[in-house]
Amino acid sequence: MSDLSGKTIIVTGGGSGIGRATVELLVASGANVAVADINDEAGEAVVAASGGKAAYFRCDIAQEEDVKALVAQTLAAFGGLDGAFNNAAIPQAGLPLAEVSLERFRQSMDINVTGTFLCMKYQILAMIERGTKGSIVNTASVAGVVGVPMHGEYVGAKHAVVGLTRVAAADYGKHGIRVNALVPGAVRTPMLQRAMDNDAGLEPYLNSIHPIGRFSEPHEQAQAAVWLLSDAASFVTGSCLAADGGFTAI
C-alpha cells in the first residue's frame, strides 16, 4: 500500500463506484480526502465511514463557481492540496452518432470535458501558489484511446480528457506537478450493476471482450489511481495507465 500520510487529495465523483473505492484506499493510506459529489447522501455516507479523515463538499464539476469553492473549501479544511483524482463523469446509453441529440452531446462535453478542465485549472493554480509538487489523475476510459461504437459523444469527451491530461503534464512539469490519466475498461459500478440486473446477457458479454476474461472491480481501479497519486509514480507524467484487462491490446 502506498504511504500518503498527511497528504490531502480531492476525489470528485467520490460517492460511489471507482471514486468511493479510491476514497477508502486513500484514507487507509493515511491521506486526508475531500470527497466531492452531487449526491449528498452518498458523499456523506463515504465520509461517515472514513474515521474523520475525509470531508464532503457538494460540487457540480461543470459549474466553475462550484469547482473554485471545492478547492477553497479543501484548502480551508486541510491546509493544503497535494493531489486530485478527477473521476466524476457521465456515461450514457449507446446510440449511433447521428441519433445523438445536441443536448445530450453538450451534456457529455460539459461534464466530462469542461468539468475535468475546470478541476485541473483550479487544482493546478492552488498547487503553484503554494509551491506544491502535486499529482493529478483524470479518469479517462478505454473510450479515450480507441473508438467504441454507439458511444460517439462519450468517446469524443474521453479522447479530450486524454489530450488535456497530456497538455497539462507538459505545461506544468516544470512546477513538479504530474498529470496522468487512468484508463479503465468496464467496471462493476452501481450503474453497471443495474444494467446487468436488467440484461442477463450483458455480464457474459463484458467478460468476453476483456482478454483477462472478466471486467474490473472498483478497488482494482482505486489501486491504480492511488499509485499514480503517490510518490511511487514520481517519474510518471503525461501517461495513460490502462487498467483495462487487456481491452485496448486487441
UniProtKB/Swiss-Prot annotation:
Reactions listed under catalytic activity: 2,5-dichlorocyclohexa-2,5-dien-1,4-diol + NAD(+) = 2,5-dichlorohydroquinone + NADH + H(+)
Pfam families named among the record's database cross-references: adh_short_C2 (PF13561)
Class of this enzyme: oxidoreductase
Active site feature: Y154 (proton acceptor)
Pathway stated in the Swiss-Prot or TrEMBL entry: Xenobiotic degradation; gamma-hexachlorocyclohexane degradation
InterPro entries: NAD(P)-bd_dom_sf, Sc_DH/Rdtase_CS, SDR_fam
Record bears the keyword Oxidoreductase: yes
GO biological process: response to toxic substance
Similarity-based family: Belongs to the short-chain dehydrogenases/reductases (SDR) family.
Full protein name: 2,5-dichloro-2,5-cyclohexadiene-1,4-diol dehydrogenase
Gene coding for it: linB
